[in-house]
From Swiss-Prot:
Residues binding D-glyceraldehyde 3-phosphate, per UniProt: S149, C150, T151, T180, T209, G210, R232
S-nitrosocysteine carried by residues: C150
Molecular function via GO: glyceraldehyde-3-phosphate dehydrogenase (NAD+) (phosphorylating) activity; microtubule binding; NAD binding; NADP binding; peptidyl-cysteine S-nitrosylase activity
Secretion signal span: none
Coiled coil spans: none
Subcellular location: Cytoplasm, Cytosol; Cytoplasm, Cytoskeleton; Nucleus
Complex and partners: Homotetramer.
Annotated binding of NAD(+), by residue: R11, I12, D33, R78, S120, N314
GO terms, biological process: glucose metabolic process; glycolytic process; microtubule cytoskeleton organization; neuron apoptotic process; peptidyl-cysteine S-trans-nitrosylation; positive regulation of canonical NF-kappaB signal transduction; positive regulation of type I interferon production; protein stabilization
UniProt record similarity statement: Belongs to the glyceraldehyde-3-phosphate dehydrogenase family.
Native source organism of the sequence: Pelodiscus sinensis
Record-annotated site: Activates thiol group during catalysis: H177
Stated name of the protein: Glyceraldehyde-3-phosphate dehydrogenase
Length: 333
């Protein structure tokens, strides 16, 4: 049983906790959040506007958060170095505040007794792992790793299957992305990224994303061959990747469909999905897979130039991969 601590009880922290309660290989033993007191944690975990009520029991008891009868130690430290993970029995920490995303900053958790840290965001310098793509390259000399971003987790399996079968010359990605907490409800100041400060519910907002370039880090052969951008759109959850790429080896679109379907039923089962249905974004709310290839939405200009479409629940799919990565890391101890 992998004993886990969660730092930051926001969208991802709460959903990693939900995902952990569907997995019998992990156990959440501690949660740290200086901004949310225990009773508020109970409320925030129980009710969720996007994913619905938690199907189970949640209560506060003797200063602990008790989920499905399991007591979880609560810390309220601002400085990660002060969190006594070791005392709570947490060996692995999910760093999901969005603040401590470098190796140096995330390493602070090790001072409190944690053995390893998974950053639930892209990192400037921590090694990035995408389940189903490069997780086999993990070795236990690494103390701090990143689970990359939700978009990289959607794009990388798609890019891997295409590159392994046909060779990718180059590609451009667009993610049509649901609203996230960093956006504004109405127009407001936003540092250097002026567009990002515009009202999230009122606009389609062009934005930058490092997700495509990050694929080059997890699939080295694609380094420098992919870049991309995002459009933030007024939906609460579920995003979609549009990958337009040139293939080295010509392929009929029907053959690409067959290859994607085979991958989704084989080595990438549970990570890559496949559908030929006439789906829309809300059909994937609560989907635990990283990337669901939409066979009916893609198009080919010719045998070497194609547009591929893949859906993802940017909250829940990603949170499940964080749990999967923790389980994989523990298997290498």
């Amino acid at each position: 049983m992998v004993k886990i601590g969660v730092n930051g009880f926001g969208r991802i922290g709460r959903l990693v906790t939900r995902a952990a309660f569907t997995c019998d290989k992990v156990q959440i033993v501690a949660i740290n959040d200086p901004f949310i007191d225990l009773n508020y944690m109970v409320y925030m975990f129980k009710y969720d506007s996007t994913h619905g009520r938690f199907h189970g029991t949640v209560k506060a008891e003797n200063g602990k958060l008790v989920i499905n009868g399991q007591a979880i130690t609560i810390f309220q430290e601002r400085d990660p170095a002060n969190i006594k993970w070791g005392d709570a029995g947490a060996e692995y920490v999910v760093e999901s505040t969005g603040v401590f995303t470098t190796t140096e900053k995330a390493s602070a958790h090790l001072k409190g007794g944690a053995k390893r840290v998974v950053i639930s965001a892209p990192s400037a310098d921590a090694p990035m792992f995408v389940m189903g793509v490069n997780h086999e390259k993990y070795d236990n000399s690494l103390k701090v790793v990143s689970n990359a971003s939700c978009t990289t987790n959607c794009l990388a399996p798609l890019a891997k299957v295409i590159h392994d079968n046909y060779g990718m010359v180059e590609g451009l990605m667009t993610t049509v992305h649901a609203i996230t907490a960093t956006q504004k409800t109405v127009d407001g100041p936003s540092g250097k990224l002026w567009r990002d400060g515009r009202g999230a519910a009122q606009n389609i907002i062009p934005a930058s994303t490092g997700a495509a370039k990050a694929v080059g880090k997890v699939i080295p052969e694609l380094n420098g061959k992919l870049t991309g951008m995002a459009f933030r759109v007024p939906t609460p959850n579920v995003s979609v990747v549009d990958l337009t790429c040139r293939l080295q080896k010509p392929a009929k679109y029907d053959d690409i469909k067959k290859v994607m379907k085979a991958a989704s039923e084989g080595p990438l089962k549970g990570i890559l999905g496949y559908t030929e249905d006439q789906v829309v974004s809300s059909d994937f709310n609560g989907d635990s897979r990283s990337s669901i290839f939409d066979a009916a939405a893609g198009i080919a200009l010719n045998d070497n130039f194609v547009k591929l479409v893949s859906w993802y629940d940017n909250e829940f799919g990603y949170s499940n991969r964080v749990v999967d990565l923790l389980v994989h890391m523990a298997s290498k101890e």
